[in-house]
Regions:
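C-terminal subregions of glycosyltransferases and related glycan-biosynthesis enzymes
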Residues: 70-73, 77-190
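Conserved nucleotide-sugar donor-binding catalytic segment
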Residues: 10-101
């Protein structure tokens, strides 16, 4: 079975050092991979926007998708963290009712999570590096969303925030070439 994190050794670190694709590709969006002090969690529930959290539609707002990231930042941003290299649970993947939204999650919700981490104190250079990496599939996923329409989350996209603001990152543009390279590589293998 493939591990969620590529980490091979346990590591003590600071909270924001967890936000790295070399630690966890989803930047803590996979809630099931986290263990934390419940008391700190409960003491910081006030940061949630309950009105936006109740918005209908799977992954429709940052708050109904990533509410726990707001809590994590409020509760743990000044805390030490521990990365356990050996998996403590088995989490299987298979059918996901939101699988058609994966491109949307990767190029909209993950960058939004990084923006939020930055607003809560993440180092600028770490933010820029990580955000650039997160946009490695930007154009091909954006076109998939445009073609797929509402069922792929097009109705949740804010063109200015989710498209234009990401064009300053090199990987947004390189994503075109990455996509072509992967396609050519697949054809050569066949």
């Amino acid at each position: 079975m493939k591990k969620h994190s590529p980490m091979k050794k346990n590591k003590k670190t600071k909270f924001f050092q967890l936000i790295d694709h070399r630690v966890c590709f989803d930047y803590l969006l996979g809630f099931y991979v986290n263990a934390f002090r419940r008391e700190l969690w409960c003491n910081n529930l006030n940061v949630i926007n309950k009105k936006l959290m109740k918005t209908s539609g799977t992954w429709s707002t940052f708050d109904n998708t990533c509410f726990f990231i707001r809590i994590f930042c409020s509760a743990f941003k000044n805390s030490n963290a521990f990365i356990c290299a050996k998996p403590l649970s088995v989490n299987l993947s298979g059918f996901r009712e939101w699988s058609n939204l994966y491109p949307f999650v990767e190029i909209v919700r993950l960058p939004e999570a990084l923006d939020y981490y930055r607003s809560e104190g993440m180092n600028f250079w770490q933010y820029a590096y990580t955000k650039n990496y997160s946009l490695r599939n930007f154009f091909n996923y954006f076109f998939k969303i445009l073609i797929g329409g509402k069922k792929m989350g097009l109705n949740y996209i804010n063109f200015k925030n989710h498209f234009l603001k990401n064009l300053i990152y090199p990987n947004a543009w390189f994503s075109i070439f990455y996509y072509i390279w992967r396609k050519v590589k697949l054809e050569v293998i066949r």
